[in-house]
Swiss-Prot record:
CDD domains: RPE. A divalent metal cation binds at residues 50, 52, 81, 199. InterPro entries: Aldolase_TIM, Ribul_P_3_epim-like, RibuloseP-bd_barrel. GO terms for biological process: carbohydrate metabolic process. GO terms for cellular component: plasma membrane. Its main location: membrane. This is Putative epimerase LsrE. It is found in: Cell membrane.
Length: 254
């Protein structure tokens, strides 16, 4: 599924990634069924897998380390979100493990520019070649948006969290929509070439408003695996974007 990224420039990779509006939080499923999930997602032409790497220090939870990235099939695009105390070390390990997209937390590193600059020089394998590492920055609900201004030229993805990492306290929908509007206003003409992502316990009811605002992608985990209906739920979520006119990525059965 990721062979189409082989040999593309960073700008071309970003444009292609922007046509995939769903990243599946694969760790939210039952791990014993992981092989089945991956087969189902591949059959659905769903290439983006989202992995939350938590170390129990940046936030209370502990999930997996960079080693897990390398255990997933190379055919997928591995979309890694770092919520760790040492983002520099984790970023290096994730590149070595084959992560295609790496998103850092704005609150988690005093040397963000250094880490992002280094990531901008890295490439990782895809089927039939390599692609540049795509860089992201993520913000907790209470983090001022303007912290991203100094690093805008060093990121391709801007991710807004709708929950506080590890605690589960969600933003009200109205506050989330207002935050998206504020981000778009802040970006202005610098919006071009950026993928805007919303992550954190979203519901389908929120999607129409977010899509109408112009976001590019959502991350969903538990909602997709609910009732052991990954295929049906994935199709249903993607269909929300299909209504909005973005049908590039959809298989004919969706």
């Amino acid at each position: 599924m990721n062979s189409q990224f082989a040999g593309l420039t960073r700008e071309a990779c970003v444009a292609l990634l922007a046509s995939y509006p769903l990243s599946v939080g694969i760790l939210a499923g039952q791990w014993i069924a992981l092989h089945r999930y991956l087969q189902q997602l591949e059959a659905l032409n769903q290439p983006l897998l989202h992995l939350d790497l938590m170390d129990g220090q940046f936030c209370p939870q502990f999930t997996v380390g960079p080693w897990a990235v390398g255990q997933l099939p190379q055919t997928f695009i591995k979309d890694v979100h770092l919520m760790v105390a040492d983002q520099w070390a984790a970023a290096q390990a994730c590149v070595k493990a084959g992560a295609h997209c790496i998103t850092l937390q704005a609150e988690g590193d005093i040397h963000l520019h250094h880490t992002l600059s280094w990531l901008g020089q890295q490439t990782v394998p895809v089927i039939d070649g390599e692609m540049p590492v795509i860089r992201g920055i993520s913000l907790c609900p209470a983090t001022p948006l303007d912290v991203i201004i100094p690093i805008l030229s060093d990121v391709e993805v801007i991710q807004l969290l709708a929950v506080n990492p590890g605690y589960g306290s969600k933003m009200r929908s109205s506050d989330l929509y207002e935050r998206v509007a504020q981000l778009l206003c802040l970006l202005g003409d610098k919006r071009e070439g950026k993928i805007i992502v919303i992550d954190g316990s979203l519901t389908q009811d929120q999607l129409p408003s977010l899509i109408a605002q112009g976001i590019d992608r959502v991350v969903s985990g538990s909602a997709l695996f609910r009732d052991d209906r990954l295929v049906e739920n994935t199709r249903s979520w993607r269909a929300m974007f299909k209504v909005a006119g973005d049908t590039t990525f959809l298989p004919s059965t969706a």
